[in-house]
Amino acid sequence: MRLLSIASGSSGNCIYVGDDTTHILIDAGISGKRIEAGLNSIGVSGKDLDAVFVTHEHIDHISGIGVLSRKYDVPIYATSGTIAGISTTRSVGDIDDQLYQVIHKNENITVGGLLIKAVPISHDAAEPVCYTITNGKSHAAIATDMGCYTEKIVENLKGMDAILLEANHDVNMLQVGPYPYYLKQRILGDRGHLSNENAGRLLCRLLHDNLKAIFLGHLSRENNYEELAYETVCSEVTLGDNPYKSKDFRIQVAKRDFVSDVVTV
């Protein structure tokens, strides 16, 4: 199974997960042209897409979904709350109602050779989820836009071979930055975003011998930067309370404006 971050950041998100027979996207929050270029970089065409799974209705996760649906008739899987939110976002354009497929929280959906589970998360959206994906041999998770993590989330994210985990902001940069007070409180709240430190603490709960690839994603342009996110998370892993601190895990930061390295698990 392959995982490719086509884009990840506060300005747009799109992640490819697939194998030889099945190709899906988690979110489509960038232009259709960028999505197609990212897919083409690994030999996949837009017409090969079997489904797009949407985490929630914020524009940085759905801005390209209308283009994809109209061009390729690709099914769109999302919770009913997310579908309602997409339907009222005028900039997305018209989407054929028949392309929408409702996925319920904690439900498993089979698409081709992949089994996808929608895991409920805490974020200021209608009915947000993150996703775990498996082909029966390998396991991956895309987990961003979480203000906090619960034991249920930890339980669902354990045992992955690859994971893209939110490391949205540095708390100090956010607090002294230019954002208005209400927005700072939103980001820092339980329905906001994971900080670098909390991403590292969550990662400590998820480490195991077979975790081959770790992406840090959804970085804020204004309140974070790649080196800081990487160093903070690595510090939490090295100094944190976990039995794997001495092991060499591959951690990389998913790029905002460029396709990241594809990983195979």
Spell out what each predicted region is.
Residues 1-42, 127-145, 162:
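Conserved beta-strand hairpin/beta-sheet module of binuclear metal-dependent hydrolase folds
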Residues 26-29, 50-57, 77-80, 141-144, ...:
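Active-site neighborhood of phospho(di)ester-bond hydrolases with catalytic His/Asp-centered motifs
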Residues 33-79:
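Active-site metal-binding motif and surrounding structural segment of the metallo-beta-lactamase
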Residues 59-62, 83-85, 125-126, 148-151, ...:
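Active-site environment of divalent metal-dependent phosphoester hydrolases
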Residues 63-72, 87-90, 224-231:
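Metal-dependent catalytic neighborhoods of phosphoester/phosphodiester hydrolases
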Residues 80-130, 134-137:
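Metallo-beta-lactamase
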Residues 151-251:
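Cap/insert and terminal regions of metallo-dependent hydrolase folds
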Residues 249-265:
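Short, basic/aromatic-enriched C-terminal tail that caps enzymatic domains
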